[in-house]
A protein has these predicted regions:
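Extracellular interaction modules
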Residues: 251
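Concave beta-strand-loop units of leucine-rich repeat
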Residues: 2-11, 20, 24-28, 35-46, ...
Length: 260
């Protein structure tokens, strides 16, 4: 495994990488493998062709670099790939990683998923910061279990939400108005749902999420009826002041954590 974050690198995983919001800055905080807080400067990696010289690498993280494209990726056996906080707008080139199982590209203003549909083994996908209106590349990803998306509408999300393989869903800055909880194909399979700064106008259908054990709701305004939570097997609910009181009043037996 190789972990590059800004101008530093390790062969063990950092405890916490840079924040996705670091895309527009030149220095950022992260936590190294030993637990030390470190300030890193943006790295100058712009090309990934050297990965061809490391055929045995299966885990590669190149966070907080100067990548504007993945077109330089060589065909290789990387399975876990993290390109968070770079300057990417397209995933074109990602198809060179046919064994890819997990892709994290948070903090990139990605608008184009071209090539991702050829990575048929992807189980985990995180695109917090992306603004993609065409999610058709996700149709072929029949093994997708864990997805994070941002700046989508409920209608645009129908392709991933209709996947029967999904178990974990995180949505950030999405417009979910219009019967969101009825938009899933197999809501019973969802174990974790996180909604951050999303627009939501109804909780109708929430009672069908009978496998849900973890719920996070932050930055979601409006008067919403959370009474369905009382019948779900939830273990933990995290909410901010906007919804915490209404959730606590739902009768849920879950531990309700109030976030800032």
């Amino acid at each position: 495994a190789l972990y590059v974050c800004g101008d530093r690198y390790w062969f063990a995983a950092p405890q916490q990488g840079v924040d996705a919001a670091a895309a527009g800055v030149e220095t950022a905080e992260m936590t190294d493998p030993s637990g030390q807080s470190v300030t890193v400067r943006r790295g100058d990696i712009r090309d990934l062709s050297d990965l061809a010289y490391f055929p045995s690498l299966t885990v590669v993280s190149v966070q907080f670099q100067s990548l504007t494209s993945l077109e330089s990726l060589p065909a290789c056996g990387v399975e876990v790939f993290d390109v968070s906080a770079n300057r990417l707008t397209s995933l074109s080139g990602i198809e060179q990683l046919p064994k890819l199982t997990a892709l994290t590209a948070d903090g990139n203003a990605v608008t184009d998923l071209t090539g991702l549909g050829r990575c048929l083994n992807v189980r985990k996908l995180s695109l917090n910061g992306a603004n993609v209106s065409d999610l058709s590349e996700l149709r072929a990803l029949t093994k997708l279990q864990d997805i994070t998306l941002s700046h989508c509408t409920r209608r645009e999300l129908l392709i991933p939400l209709h996947k029967s393989s999904l178990t974990r869903v995180t949505l950030v800055d999405c417009d979910l108005r219009g019967d969101f909880f009825h938009s899933f194909d197999r809501e019973r399979a969802i174990t974790s749902l996180t909604l951050i700064r999303c627009e939501l106008d109804s909780t109708s259908g929430l009672e069908d999420f009978t496998g849900l054990t973890e719920l996070t709701v932050r930055g979601v305004s409006g008067s919403l009826d959370w009474s369905a939570l009382g019948s779900l097997p939830l273990q933990t609910v995290t909410a901010d002041a906007l919804q915490a009181d209404a959730i606590a009043a739902s009768g849920t037996t879950a531990t309700v954590k109030v976030a800032d």
